[in-house]
């Protein structure tokens, strides 16, 4: 195996590093810089530009310049340049090709293998898209690792003492926070949280919106409608943000920003740090929720956290540093370069894979729960969030209708009890199931998450061995609203979800009891005296009426009522015929049963596929 480079593919800037002489070093690019702008441009002659050269021509060529493409990874977003459309993977690949070329020039050899980092809160689709971008760029992506984990790896490489660290990673477009334990070469992630739609770009946008509003107030011209002016404002906002980390006031001076009826207009504005903090206060506050969540998930207190490590250029913002300091009660660690530490960690992981680095074990986790939709629209978890990866877990389900020959598997990711509120990762179908009464076929659904955090799902008919496998490739990513729904709504609506799930479980149990009772009455038709059959039929009708309503306690009561009159009769019938009475689990709650483990069978919401429509 040759050199395995480590790449931090960022929203605003990217960085590449490699192991040399047992140490991770950042590779300087062709322009002499240690980081490369994540910008792609297309010149008027059709030439593709990436990095600093693309950023330089952005003002004069805004329509053919692409920035912050990372925010669209894993979605069906397209970039239209002239008469061609580009996917986020293709644009990202152009940035990766630039980094690859810089690494090859530095090393003096061809580079074909890489470790690429992604935000810890990236979904399966976003991780797969990142891996695909690497492939397009001509790289064999040996591993996708989480950015906070990579940062901790770089921080902890030379640390001898055991410690617990919190990595607070606020980059250009994403935010992650992870709790990790470092112990003699072991880097173990305990919990992770974040927001895929929060980063430095959002801070820039607040400044842009403010300058546009102030200019419109003064000059009566809306700069938001001018692409060239907006690009200049974008660069000015980014520069002002950086300057306000070191000074209390900065001046934004953009001559000839636009033309008015009276001639050229100029933008000249002073912005104070206090104004900037006022404009972005809610963005800073938005980082604290996931931080508290990660701490709670790891079951740790701030007293048990030894270090708070700041990663990502946006953590240089004083208000961000002050917020995390106030929350944690600790002075953030300043011993790492927030722009480079992630790439250095990726290079170390590359060294581990290449055999250059010994005695380091990396243990990461999956950020969100994974499961499938089952009867009644319930989200049945198969892998819980913050489970160590790689991992494989399975659960056995059954059919929901008699003679059902195929099942649809609806794969989801999220934290809500109801499937409709979680994120669909994909769907696939298992067909060829031999016709049988419902509840008889046993279908094993297996989830496998590899070391890259990419999900593979299979469904297998235990009787025939017929199996269908799929690597989940969803076409949509998680927006900020969806992320908030998955985490915050899970708590805000916990009671509502719990009651709704309890109602569905009660209805499922009642439905199962109705089905079993009617089947029993049919099987013993003519053998049960009318005076004994009547109470069963009466209780059955009462149960059907209750099950049509929303009263959970009444449904449970009527289900129990059928059990009380039915079981003695069945036992008597079996004694008369010399058979054994059925087990006590007849009509058991299918929803609750499925949560017991791999040996249980639950009714899953599957749809029978008409043969003519296949």
UniProtKB/Swiss-Prot annotation:
Ranges of Low complexity composition bias in the record: 578-589
Keywords from the named record: ATP-binding, Chaperone, Nucleotide-binding, Phosphoprotein, Stress response
Source superkingdom: Bacteria
Pfam families in the cross-refs: HSP70
Family of the protein in this entry: Belongs to the heat shock protein 70 family.
PROSITE patterns: HSP70_1 (PS00297), HSP70_2 (PS00329), HSP70_3 (PS01036)
Phosphothreonine sites (modified residues): 174
Annotated stretches, region: Disordered: 576-614
Organism taxonomic ancestry: Bacteria, Bacillati, Bacillota, Clostridia, Eubacteriales
GO molecular function, one term: unfolded protein binding
HAMAP family hit by this protein: DnaK
Name of the protein in its database record: Chaperone protein DnaK
SUPFAM superfamilies xrefs: Actin-like ATPase domain (SSF53067), Heat shock protein 70kD (HSP70), C-terminal subdomain (SSF100934), Heat shock protein 70kD (HSP70), peptide-binding domain (SSF100920)
Induction: By stress conditions e.g. heat shock.
Function: Acts as a chaperone.
């Amino acid at each position: 195996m040759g050199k395995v480079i480590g790449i931090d593919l960022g929203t605003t800037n990217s960085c590449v590093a490699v192991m040399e002489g047992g140490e991770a070093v950042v590779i300087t690019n062709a322009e002499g810089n240690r980081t490369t702008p994540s910008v792609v441009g297309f010149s008027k002659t059709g030439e593709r530009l990436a990095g600093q050269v693309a950023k330089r021509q952005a003002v004069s060529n805004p329509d053919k310049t692409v920035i912050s493409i990372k925010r669209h990874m894993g979605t069906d977003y397209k970039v239209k340049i002239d008469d061609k459309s580009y996917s986020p993977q293709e644009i990202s690949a152009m940035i990766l090709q630039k980094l690859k070329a810089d690494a090859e020039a530095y090393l003096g050899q061809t580079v074909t293998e890489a470790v690429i980092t992604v935000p810890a809160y990236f979904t399966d689709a976003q991780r797969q898209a990142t891996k695909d971008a690497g492939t397009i760029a001509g790289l064999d992506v040996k591993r996708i690792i989480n950015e906070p984990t990579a940062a901790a790896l770089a921080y902890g490489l030379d640390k001898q003492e055991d410690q617990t660290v919190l990595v607070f990673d606020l980059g250009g477009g994403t935010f992650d926070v992870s709790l990790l334990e470092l112990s003699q070469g072991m880097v173990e992630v305990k919990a992770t949280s974040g927001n895929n739609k929060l980063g430095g770009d959002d801070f820039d946008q607040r400044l842009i919106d403010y300058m546009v509003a102030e200019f419109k107030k003064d000059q009566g011209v809306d700069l938001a409608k001018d692409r060239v002016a907006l690009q200049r404002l974008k660069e000015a906002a980014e520069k002002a943000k950086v300057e306000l980390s070191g000074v209390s006031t900065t001046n934004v001076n953009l001559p000839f920003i636009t033309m008015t009826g009276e001639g050229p207009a100029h933008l000249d504005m002073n912005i104070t740090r206090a104004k900037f903090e006022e404009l972005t206060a809610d963005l800073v506050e938005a980082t604290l929720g996931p931080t508290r969540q990660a701490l709670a998930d790891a079951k740790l207190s701030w007293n048990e956290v030894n270090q708070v490590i700041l990663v990502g250029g946006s953590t240089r913002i004083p208000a961000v540093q002050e917020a995390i300091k106030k929350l944690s009660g600790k002075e953030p660690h300043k011993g790492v370069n927030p722009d480079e530490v992630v790439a250095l960690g990726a290079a170390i992981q590359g060294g581990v894979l290449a055999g250059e680095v010994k005695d380091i074990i990396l243990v990461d986790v999956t950020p969100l729960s994974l499961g499938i939709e089952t009867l009644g629209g319930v989200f049945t978890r198969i892998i819980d969030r913050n489970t160590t990866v790689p991992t494989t877990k399975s659960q056995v389900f059954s059919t929901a209708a008699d003679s059902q020959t195929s099942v649809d598997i609806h794969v989801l990711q999220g934290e809500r009890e109801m499937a409709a509120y979680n994120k669909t990762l994909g769907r696939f179908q298992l067909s060829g199931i031999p016709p049988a009464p419902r509840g008889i076929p046993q279908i094993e659904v297996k989830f496998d998450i590899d070391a890259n955090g990419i999900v593979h799902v299979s469904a297998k008919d235990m009787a025939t061995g017929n199996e269908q496998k799929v690597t989940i490739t969803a076409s949509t990513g998680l927006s900020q609203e969806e992320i908030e729904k998955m985490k915050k709504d899970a708590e805000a609506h916990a009671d509502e979800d719990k009651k709704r799930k309890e109602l569905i479980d009660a209805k499922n149990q009642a439905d199962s009891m109705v089905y079993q009772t009617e089947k029993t009455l049919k099987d013993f038709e003519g053998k049960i005296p009318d005076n004994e059959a009547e109470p069963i039929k009466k209780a059955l009708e009462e149960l059907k009426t209750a099950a049509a309503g929303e009263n959970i306690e009444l449904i449970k009561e009527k289900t129990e009522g059928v059990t009380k009159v039915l079981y003695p009769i069945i036992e008597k019938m079996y004694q008369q015929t010399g058979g054994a009475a059925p087990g006590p689990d007849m009509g058991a709650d299918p929803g609750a049963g499925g949560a017991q483990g791999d040996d249980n069978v639950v009714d899953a919401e599957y749809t029978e596929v008409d043969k003519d429509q296949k």
